[in-house]
């Protein structure tokens, strides 16, 4: 039965193709001029490329406009190796025991979530002394221990990360304005 249906489908398909190909006039779809079709009939309107063809034409035109601009300024292009070499993270060197300044962006009970500009943020406990001073948006000093807490568990072939950095909270970063105010109050 399946073979019988298949032959009927092929026969219907070939009949459709025969009708579609031989009884429709060729109009040169996708070309700007009708010269490829072999007829130069003035009554026949020019057909525009549609869908993908028109998008490809527009994209090609944009690329042609951009190419002269790119050739004129090769000095602005910097290689990845150069950007990596001059990045602040690479210039910093090993992260262990580096002093950085961060900003508290989230607080959950006594946990302070601090962003210091690294790949991950760090979580530190709120100090018991002057704990009320550590509010959201406060700038704090940190001593980095590790930029990424990772560990390889027993039998694992890859490291598992906690998506956090490890740092010790040293205190609030005093700005120049706050220091000058304290000096004026003491005098």
Curated annotation (Swiss-Prot):
The modification Phosphoserine is found at residue 73. Pfam families: MRP-S35 (PF10246). Residues 1-71 form a transit peptide. GO terms for cellular component: mitochondrial inner membrane; mitochondrial small ribosomal subunit; mitochondrion. It is linked to Combined oxidative phosphorylation deficiency 47: An autosomal recessive, multisystemic, mitochondrial disorder characterized by intrauterine growth retardation, swallowing difficulties with failure to thrive, hypoglycemia, dehydration, and hepatomegaly. Additional features include global developmental delay with impaired intellectual development and absent speech, microcephaly, facial dysmorphism, cataract, sensorineural deafness, skeletal features, and cryptorchidism. Coiled coil: none annotated. This is Small ribosomal subunit protein bS1m.
